[in-house]
């Protein structure tokens, strides 16, 4: 597994003029992967949270597909690699890139839904209204965590004084625990850690009406056509792996050992593997059907409200952002759920 520049950046979203310019500079050339070969650009380091994906990749390899994964420092860099033809498949939700640049890229598999928890230090805040004029910390500019916090600010009629960018849910949880951050948003592992280490000190703020894609797979449309059989195998293995984990989250620990994944994982993090997946499964973070038109329309509503997609969500066309052909073919083989 080839490893590129590494930085915690699992939720960085594609947004901003700099990326648009970079995408034009790449020229949108189509990738030229060899038959049965794919290069996946992952905008993050390999962590406990990516084990399910790594397991599915190993199973794809077992079926004869030559898969290479490069871990980039952020999802925007990974997206540039896909647009420029240096990689075939990316991980993220590049709605803004597709809309602004008109890149020949389409999303084709929903890997996870946003499942995060806005959390505050109760010594200072106890409600959304208390955050009016206050500073918060999110993962990164344009990220799903930022989108959630901006959306909740709109819903509650408040304005933050500043948004700080602190990559990594575990880093933000640590900053909350140390008192360096007073309001942030974390994943289930971070929430559980805070509740265990400081009972009663932190409060999860209510969050209704948030249902959107966290991570999805996307690729150049020419690659999807040229390598349709290999892509179909990947999607089949993703579906089967997700369903196995949803049925029994503990299996992730066994499969990690079977495929020798994250062999250098620190001992203190090994104990987080099963709890993380149990928490994610409990919140239905991993769709068993790979997404669909209903999920995409949820994305349109969410990311439009958060300012990351332009236009009336009702007027946006699913086919301008997604293709479901690989998923439909895979579902025909493994069955729908």
Language model regions located:
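Bacterial N-terminal signal peptides
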Residues: 15-27
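Sec/Tat signal peptide C-region and signal peptidase I cleavage site
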Residues: 28-34
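Short, glycine-/small- and polar/acidic-enriched structural segments
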Residues: 34-167, 173-178, 182-188, 202-205, ...
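Residues at alpha-helix termini
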Residues: 63-65, 156, 197, 259, ...
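Pocket-lining segment of extracytoplasmic ligand-binding domains
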Residues: 94-95, 171-264
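Secondary-structure end/capping motifs
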Residues: 226-310
């Amino acid at each position: 597994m080839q490893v590129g520049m590494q930085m915690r950046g699992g939720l960085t979203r594609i947004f901003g003029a700099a990326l648009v310019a970079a995408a034009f500079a790449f020229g949108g050339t189509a990738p030229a992967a060899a038959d049965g070969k794919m290069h996946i650009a992952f905008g993050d380091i390999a962590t406990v949270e990516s084990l399910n994906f790594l397991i599915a990749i190993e199973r794809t390899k077992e079926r004869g597909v030559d898969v290479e994964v490069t871990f980039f420092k952020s999802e925007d860099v990974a997206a540039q690699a896909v647009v420029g033809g240096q990689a075939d498949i990316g991980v993220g939700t590049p709605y803004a890139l597709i809309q602004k640049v008109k890149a020949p890229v389409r999303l084709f598999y929903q890997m996870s839904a946003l499942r995060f928890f806005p959390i505050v230090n109760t010594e200072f805040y106890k409600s959304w209204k208390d955050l009016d004029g206050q500073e918060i910390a999110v993962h990164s500019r344009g990220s799903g965590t930022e989108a959630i916090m901006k959306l909740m600010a709109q819903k509650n009629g408040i304005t933050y004084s500043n948004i700080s960018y602190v990559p990594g849910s575990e880093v933000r949880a640590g900053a909350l625990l140390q008192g360096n951050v007073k309001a942030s948003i974390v994943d289930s592992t971070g929430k559980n850690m805070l509740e265990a280490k400081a009972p009663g000190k932190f409060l999860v703020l209510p969050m209704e009406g948030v249902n959107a894609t966290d991570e999805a797979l996307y690729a150049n449309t020419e690659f999807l056509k040229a390598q349709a059989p290999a892509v179909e195998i990947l999607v089949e293995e993703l579906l089967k792996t997700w369903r196995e984990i949803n049925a029994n989250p503990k299996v992730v620990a066994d499969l990690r050992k079977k495929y020798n994944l994250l062999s250098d994982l620190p001992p203190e993090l090994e104990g987080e593997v099963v709890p993380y997946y149990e928490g994610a499964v409990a919140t239905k973070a991993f769709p068993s059907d790979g997404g669909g038109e209903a999920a995409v329309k949820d994305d349109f509503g969410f990311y439009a409200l958060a300012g990351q997609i332009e236009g009336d969500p009702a007027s946006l066309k699913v086919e301008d952002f997604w293709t479901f052909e690989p998923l439909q073919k895979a579902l025909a083989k493994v069955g729908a759920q």
